[in-house]
Amino acid sequence: ETVLRRERAAGKRVSCVYVVPNFQNPTGTLIGADKRLGLLELAARHNLLIIEDDPYGELYFDERDAHITRPIKADDREGRVIYLSSFSKTLAPGFRVAWLAAPAALASKLDVAKQAADLCTGSLDQRVVYESWKRGLLTERVPQLRAHYRDKKNAMERVTRSELGDLATWREPRGGFFLWVALPVHLNAETLLARAVREKVVYV
């Protein structure tokens, strides 16, 4: 809200808020339930739209955590949320097929904008996604992906802990692809990058 007031005071027109609520890239941040409702209240007070981008919401690691990724859109009573998601994280990265849920008036305008950008998404990709959905392949695949990425997360934490010890801190992610590691203030990330390049180590 402070940022919003500052931007408007500077004469800038703010009409929407863009948010990735679940396991955001690159920090893996998960927005809590109270803050999600707070965003809806903020949008109502200031007449804003919320663009909710949720490509990772299905990729929580523990079935008991399914509720933590509840879309903001699920509590939208005023038609303020445009919900976006993608099949590229749950089916295959090569299928750049996404979808949205929005009030009809907005959806029709977004449809026109999509056509102006690239006419339409490839028909073959759309057909593969449709058949996968219809045959229940996604229902089978998503739990497998959760287990796969949970195992990769656990392996990454083990290696980070063994190699960096107390030099690194992080909050254990509850889903998604990302593990955000914080280094002590006396370590310079740019210096480490140069060393990583010399050692031919991938550095993000």
Labelled PLM ranges:
Residues E1-V204:
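PLP-dependent class I/II
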